[in-house]
Curated annotation (Swiss-Prot):
GO terms for cellular component: chloroplast thylakoid membrane; photosystem II reaction center. The gene is psbK. Residues 1-21 form a propeptide. The chain crosses the membrane at residues 29-49. Belongs to the PsbK family. InterPro entries: PSII_PsbK (IPR003687), PSII_PsbK_sf (IPR037270). One of the components of the core complex of photosystem II (PSII). PSII is a light-driven water:plastoquinone oxidoreductase that uses light energy to abstract electrons from H(2)O, generating O(2) and a proton gradient subsequently used for ATP formation. It consists of a core antenna complex that captures photons, and an electron transfer chain that converts photonic excitation into a charge separation. This is Photosystem II reaction center protein K. It is found in: Plastid, Chloroplast thylakoid membrane. The keyword Membrane applies. PANTHER family: PHOTOSYSTEM II REACTION CENTER PROTEIN K, PTHR35325. It is a single-pass membrane protein. It comes from Adiantum capillus-veneris (Maidenhair fern).
Amino acid sequence: MTVSYSIYLENSLHFGDALLAKLPEAYAIFDPIVDVMPVIPVFFLLLAFVWQAAVSFR
């Protein structure tokens, strides 16, 4: 149990590092797009509610 718990903590720390990683210089022009990409699924969720409101929640 303690082994799996420490592995979980170790992996979560590495995952946190990945969120703060910078793109290589060759891809620096895509940085604004990459900043917006995590929000795109939220737009689809909101689109579902707008669509249902448009069809009167059938």
